[in-house]
Amino acid sequence: MLKNKNLLATIVALTVMVIAALFLTQKEQNNSSNSTEKVKIGVLQFVTHDSLDEIYKGIKAGLKEGGYITTDNLEIDFMNAEGDQSQVQTMSKKLVDNGNELLIGIATPAAQGLANATTELPIIMGAVTDPVGANLVTDLKNPGGNITGVSDQTPVADAVSLIKEITPDAKTIGVLYSSNEDNSKIQVAEFKTAAEEAGYAVLEYAVASSNEIAATVEVASSKADVLFTPVDNTVASAFSTVVSVANKTKTPIFTSVEDMVEGGGIASVTLSQYDLGVATGKMAAKILDGANPADTPVQIFNEGTVVVNQKVAKELGITLSDDVISKASKVIE
């Protein structure tokens, strides 16, 4: 009888252990499943060039800071329209249809394409100069819809001051930009006001596509003492052409982003495109965590730093003063 009782106790104990083991195994499987479950987001980049590429790098870093990592819990559905507006529309629709939980548009045309494709999915703007003017939000502090993000606003008054410091004898500034980019038109209008207030004559040179850049720069560099280009995707994508043509007349080019100074511009009051991307990624993470785009204020990036290219200055016969060098956050030799 005692043996039977011991046998029964053993069987019960073993049964409990088996059930417990099965429970723990199931729990571990559930935890493992939860840890590998990925959030899927769509990213649309307007065109390939260094500035927008840096923004995309920053976006991934910002998402990582916010807890969303591509090797763990994040899947990015990335598309690049390569400057083709028809592709912007096609890709925007694809990103909406692909089951993404959130969308990010890098540059104004990309953000506008996504906005036209959905009013339901949250959209984060990356590098949109005038979100209100681009009809993406109704108010910067209270966007009011499914869109918020980060706005880059070139400090044009500082840019004019830098031109005066580096080329004090210049009287005429030629401004090169794309006629198809709303953000560029806004920057040009603001720059023109600041430059004219400082006593400069401003000549505008708008191009409809990168195919027109060489001929346009040839005319501009023959008539203007210096050239200026805002944050402009079309110009940036063909900046090597701008430099090669302007160098024929030794016309200095002032830009609005660092990589264009590295690519042959003389100087810039620049916004960090990478940092702008980081801010965009962190905001995307915030929305994924449950924040509402409608009441998430648009973040403004407008504090620039000076970057100069000493090598280009020497090639153009321009001496950069000690004051200019001392205020520069980066000097390219």
Residue ranges and their predicted role:
Residues 286-333:
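Hinge/cleft segment of the Venus flytrap/periplasmic-binding protein
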Residues 59, 148-196, 297-312:
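An alpha-beta-alpha
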Residues 113, 119-156, 253-267:
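Flexible loop/hinge segments that line or gate small-molecule binding clefts
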Residues 80-138, 229-247, 251:
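Beta-alpha junction/loop-to-helix N-cap segments that form part of ligand/metal-binding clefts
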Residues 40-60, 66, 77-86, 180, ...:
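Extracytoplasmic "Venus flytrap"
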Residues 75-97, 206-220:
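Structural motif
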Residues 1-40:
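Short, low-complexity disordered leader/linker segments with a strong preference
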Residues 131-170, 271-291:
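Hydrophobic alpha-helical segments within soluble ligand-binding/sensing domains
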